[in-house]
Amino acid sequence: MQLKIFLFKLLFLIFFSFSFNNFAFGFFFNNRYDSNFFIDKKYTKDFIFFKKNECFSFLKYKKNFFLNKKIIIGNNHFIGFFQKNRFKIFYIVKSKDTMYSIAKNSGYNYHELSKFNSIKKPYKIIIGQKIWMGDFLIDKNNNDCSILNLEKNSIKQHNSCEVVFKNLLNIEKFLKDNIKTKKICFFCIKKIKKNNNSLKLKFFNFSNNWSWPVKNKNTKYFYIDKLGNKRIEIIGFKGQPVFSTAAGEVVFVTNLFKKYGLLIIIKHDQNYLSIYAFNNSVLVKEKDRVYKNQQIATMGLSSDTNLARLYFEIRYLGESINPLSILPKINTNI
């Protein structure tokens, strides 16, 4: 009788162990290849900010039976997970988001962003999906991260992130006492200054390699700077030739965005992109190499005015810049 009981218990333990391992393995396997899972990359890249700074609330100090403890932070745009000495930052996909729109707003090439997140053509994403945007390093040598105190009567309004996150005991104590009354803020003032200096240098060295995308004796155009989108809209006639302003590779051709009609994006040397919209027809395809002044499209009608014009934009390192600072000088505008 005792032998039977022993064998029964042994079989039960074997069955339980097998079931647990399958469940744990299935949990890991399913989540490892889901872009919503916390991705542990072999490489890292710096987080590019939407604004000059990003502040996050502490959402949880999460304990999971299968995973290690996680510090989770979040705001309206991003969610972050703490690992070792850095926060891995993810964008939360919202309604009407596309990989292109996310990449454009965050300063990335959408091919690069898709590659980082193992998202392949046709680049389908779903609401709530997490797109890895980069890492923010907690570094004692940089004063670019602070813990802000939300309590009005507090004597000390902020603390260094490095002090709080330098060891696990500090983190546990801090979050146990302060998770609802503190925010963590990342600052990128130094990075912005550095980028501005490099922009001026690149403009100076690169300006002679560009030409206007429309060839008119008297070119008429509007310069528009709206919500950080710097562009010119060149007036012409429907079917008028549109030319590549510099040599490069066609990286995007689409008609998915009704506001822009047929859209072309060309990647140039030194991290520049040129964008052509409101096209009536397109004469190139993705991955085509184009040369300066090669015809790539014909002019169409803008979506809002129904008048013939070309939407033209230049981006450097994903940031919209004034095309007039690069294109050869002309005398005529509106």
From Swiss-Prot:
UniProt feature coiled coil, ranges: none
Gene Ontology cellular component terms for the protein in this record: cell division site; cell outer membrane
SUPFAM superfamilies for the chain: Duplicated hybrid motif
InterPro entries in the record: Cell_wall_metabolism_enzyme (IPR050570), Dup_hybrid_motif (IPR011055), LysM_dom (IPR018392), LysM_dom_sf (IPR036779), Peptidase_M23 (IPR016047)
A molecular function GO annotation: metalloendopeptidase activity
Signal peptide start and end residues: none
Domain LysM: 89-133
One Pfam family of this chain: Peptidase_M23
UniProt xrefs under CDD domains: LysM, M23_peptidase
Similarity section: Belongs to the E.coli NlpD/Haemophilus LppB family.
Name this polypeptide is given: Protein NlpD/LppB homolog
